[in-house]
Amino acid sequence: MKSFLLLLITCLFSRSAWTQSDVQKRYQTQLILADNGSTVNLDQGTFTFTGSLSLEDKKHIVIRGKGIDKTVLSFKGQTDGAEGLRVSNAEDIIIENLTIQDTKGDGIKTMNVKGITFRNVKVEWTGPPKADNGGYGLYPVQCDNVMIDGCTAIGASDAGIYVGQSRGIVVKNSQAYHNVAGIEIENSRNADVFNNEAYENTGGILVFDLPDLVQKQGGNVRVYNNYVHDNNLPNFAPEGNIVAGVSDGTGLLILAANRVEVFGNRFIRNQSVGTGIISYLITERPITDKGYYPFSSSISIHDNVYERDPGPPTSRGRFGKLFHSVLKFNQDIPHILYDGIADPSTLDKEGNPLPDRRICIRNNKNQSVANLDAGRGFQHVSRDAAPFNCQLDPLKITVGNDR
């Protein structure tokens, strides 16, 4: 009887080891052989991978686990590839109900996909925040019709939830924490970001337009009904990354973006900048892209709530250094900061912005504003909110919110 039990236990352990080592090959084979319109079901359990999984040139595929923290794909010992899962040149793909952990690079990257949905997906780096964590958690780039719903991103050294150079975007009902940037919309058009919680990041939400990218200018971005709080994590991005310049204590940062509407949000205990509106010129990085537009314009910030604990801002990051050495706001930091750098071609003869290119800030609880006059060396910093007391037409964005 004892010999039989020992044999049984040995067989069970051997089977377990075989399954764990074989599962990567099995899942990759399923992805390669999947017929258009099929579902790839992933088992419950924690599985360790040494290389990336990939799906290419497929249509109408569902990749489905058993649930967040029930199907866990761990890449902690990854030696081959960078992403955990990569999807490219595809159409109508759904990824749902799974967790990706500790990838060498990005968690899930989708590129050139028409119709991509992330639903109930978590991507995380399980150790402390550090520069050699992967850059992006969820990373759709150059995609159309992007839906991110009920997802979680933790520990990315760039952005937890990032949508770049894409069109027709919804990011909703999601959480991002312990990242450099919680949620980032970059060089993307027609985006709705709502009902999310971004907290304990360096910066909660970023809306950026950057040079030297295929899609030159984003716009039509709405950020609304989000809870953006306690984003005071020291910046741990690798040196040289654009987000390495984001000051800890940043709630929302709008950089060189146009046609952005921000409303119904709660910006709470972000100790440096509740909302910042800046030009790329303030970064002092060279611009060689002749098609790049480095100014922010047509920005509407209204009906938000701002709160901050008493105390000085951080001294880290570009804004932190400005606060301490140039602006000297001490503990009385305005919640909303505008660098004051405008495109001269958008100003009338009196130097005022044309009606459709204004920065409008109104009806915010605890509202306080400063124009930093950065273009003239911060000579005439103004805390007068009157020039921003205007109203732009609400943005109208048609994206697939019901997917």
Residue spans for each PLM region:
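Sec-dependent N-terminal signal peptides
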Residues: 4-12
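N-terminal signal peptide c-region/cleavage motif recognized by signal peptidases
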Residues: 14-16
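Right-handed parallel beta-helix/beta-spiral solenoid domain characteristic of secreted/periplasmic
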Residues: 20-25, 41, 57-104, 127
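Short, T/G/N/S-enriched strand-turn elements that build extracellular solenoid repeat scaffolds
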Residues: 27-34, 48-57, 63, 74, ...
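Extracellular beta-strand/beta-solenoid scaffold signature
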Residues: 27-28, 50, 76-86, 102-109, ...
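Parallel beta-helix/beta-solenoid
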Residues: 35, 57-59, 68, 85, ...
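Acidic, glycine- and Ser/Thr-rich low-complexity intrinsically disordered tracts
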Residues: 283, 289-297, 302-403
